């Protein structure tokens, strides 16, 4: 090919490239340019911005608008996926009892909830629920095996569960064959001379374990006394951000009759005329973050009392009631979830989920 032919061919190639390029940048798809971010200081340091700054400029905001639409769709889908209280809870099913607090938190009674809706919702969330329990000294032989056996059968059936078992002698742990989706972790704790100190120090211990590992392992956490037995399904209807348990002996009483700590010197002090319910420290729970806050605040109160040489009337339970007075629980469990059969079985107790064991204090406690 002569020189003239080469020149003509080169001009044709260049013209073709220019035309293709011109058509491309004016098409909706013509936005895939890359420019070194270091040459565009306005873009800033964001790796996300670096990727889409020039395409957005070429397309006059086309990609930004598209992103806004996608974000709106994602937000809408997220809102639709959230479970509303009315989706699973009907307070009017039990008109004879209190089913809603003044601050609009549900009080869960048998008949007020739809567990199938909740099970389906939480299964999609792929939650794991934790349960802490303490057994020290003779509490191990008298209560731990029955507690764990019944929990294995009734607690959060169908969902992954981790039992966190705190004992002062690991060698005395009962052998329990756990069902599917269940596991346990056993931790040795330091024994205390008085049962009151064991009760109060558990707040510190639970908080330490939440910080160390529990917060990374579960979505919800319950803390329970070992001298109880599950009688029926204790399910996902109990889950919430901050969960308190009504005390079986006091759920019908006037707040002025509650056995709150009434001494002003105590950090757990609640004056007459104040208070909503009397809560039982045998069961409380929530998200790990909320349970951590509960345990830390209660332990602060306990330490303050020790410094002032005072001990609240009902120890950690007094401090728990003070906490829930100041920080209202987002869900409350009826006495059906922690019932004492010594009371009998009133008509409003439809289905007992968990019951107290016989309190053999003279046998299990070193100091009564």
From Swiss-Prot:
Report TM segments. 7-22
Name of the gene: GGTA1
Instruction: Using the UniProt record, give the first listed, main subcellular location.
Output: Golgi
CDD domains from the entry? Glyco_transf_6 (cd02515)
Give the signal peptide, or none: none
Cofactor(s) needed, names only, are: Mn(2+)
List the glycosylation sites.
293
Name the job this protein performs.
Synthesizes the galactose-alpha(1,3)-galactose group by catalyzing the transfer of a galactose residue, with an alpha-1,3 linkage, on terminal lactosaminide (Gal-beta-1,4-GlcNAc-R) disaccharide borne by a glycoprotein or a glycolipid. Preferentially glycosylates proteins, can synthesize galactose-alpha(1,3)-galactose on glycoproteins but cannot synthesize the glycolipid called isoglobotrihexosylceramide or isogloboside 3 (iGb3).
Spell out the catalytic residues: 317 (nucleophile)
Catalyzed reactions per annotation: a beta-D-galactosyl-(1->4)-N-acetyl-beta-D-glucosaminyl derivative + UDP-alpha-D-galactose = an alpha-D-galactosyl-(1->3)-beta-D-galactosyl-(1->4)-N-acetyl-beta-D-glucosaminyl derivative + UDP + H(+)
Q: Which Pfam families match?
A: Glyco_transf_6
Report the EC number(s), separated by commas if there are several. Answer: 2.4.1.87
- Could you tell me which Gene3D superfamilies the record lists for this protein? Spore Coat Polysaccharide Biosynthesis Protein SpsA, Chain A
Q: Name one GO molecular function term.
A: N-acetyllactosaminide 3-alpha-galactosyltransferase activity
Residue numbers binding substrate:
134-139, 225-227, 247-250, 259, 359-365
State the family named in the UniProt similarity comment for this chain: Belongs to the glycosyltransferase 6 family.
Swiss-Prot/TrEMBL domain comment: The conserved DXD motif is involved in cofactor binding. The manganese ion interacts with the beta-phosphate group of UDP and may also have a role in catalysis.
Q: In which pathway does it act?
A: Protein modification; protein glycosylation
**Membrane-protein topology:** Single-pass type II membrane protein
Q: Which residues lie on this side of the membrane: Cytoplasmic?
A: 1-6
Which positions are annotated as binding Mn(2+)?
A: 225, 227
The entry's localization annotation reads: Golgi apparatus, Golgi stack membrane
Summarize the impact of residue 365 to K.
Strongly reduces catalytic efficiency
Quote the InterPro entries the UniProt record gives.
Answer: Glyco_trans_6, Nucleotide-diphossugar_trans
Q: Which organism is it from?
A: Bos taurus (Bovine)
Q: What is this protein called?
A: N-acetyllactosaminide alpha-1,3-galactosyltransferase
What enzyme class is recorded for this protein? transferase
């Amino acid at each position: 090919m002569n020189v003239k032919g080469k020149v003509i061919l080169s001009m044709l190639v260049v013209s073709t490239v220019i035309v293709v390029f011109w058509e491309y940048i004016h098409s909706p798809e013509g936005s895939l340019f890359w420019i070194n971010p270091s040459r565009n200081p306005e873009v800033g340091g964001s790796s996300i911005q670096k990727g889409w700054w020039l395409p957005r400029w070429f397309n006059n905001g086309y990609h930004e608008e598209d992103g806004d639409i996608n974000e709106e769709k994602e937000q809408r889908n997220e809102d639709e996926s959230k479970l509303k209280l009315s989706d699973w809870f009907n307070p009017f099913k039990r008109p004879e009892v209190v089913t809603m607090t003044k601050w609009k938190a549900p009080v869960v009674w048998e008949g007020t909830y739809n567990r199938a809706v909740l099970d389906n919702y939480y299964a999609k969330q792929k939650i794991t629920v934790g349960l802490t329990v303490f057994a020290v000294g003779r509490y191990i032989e008298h209560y731990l095996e029955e507690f764990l056996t019944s929990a294995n059968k009734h607690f959060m059936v169908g969902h992954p569960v981790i039992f966190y078992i705190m004992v002062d002698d690991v060698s005395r742990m009962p052998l329990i064959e756990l069902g599917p989706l269940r596991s346990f972790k056993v931790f040795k704790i330091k024994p205390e001379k008085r049962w009151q100190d064991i009760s109060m120090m558990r707040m510190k211990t639970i908080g330490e374990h939440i910080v160390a590992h529990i917060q990374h392992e579960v979505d919800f956490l319950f803390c329970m006394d070992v001298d109880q037995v599950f009688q029926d399904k204790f399910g996902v209807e109990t889950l919430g951000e901050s969960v308190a348990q009504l005390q079986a002996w006091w759920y019908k009483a006037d707040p002025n009759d509650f056995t709150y700590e009434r001494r002003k010197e105590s950090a757990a002090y609640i004056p007459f005329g104040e208070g909503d319910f009397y809560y039982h420290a045998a069961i409380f729970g929530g998200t790990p973050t909320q349970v951590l806050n509960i345990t830390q605040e209660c332990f602060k109160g306990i330490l303050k009392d020790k410094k002032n040489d005072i001990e609240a009337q009902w120890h950690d339970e007094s401090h728990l009631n003070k906490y829930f007075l100041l920080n209202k629980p987002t869900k409350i469990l009826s006495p059906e979830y922690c019932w004492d059969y010594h009371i009998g079985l009133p008509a409003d107790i439809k289905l007992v989920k968990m019951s107290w064991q016989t309190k053999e204090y003279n046998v299990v406690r070193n100091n009564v």
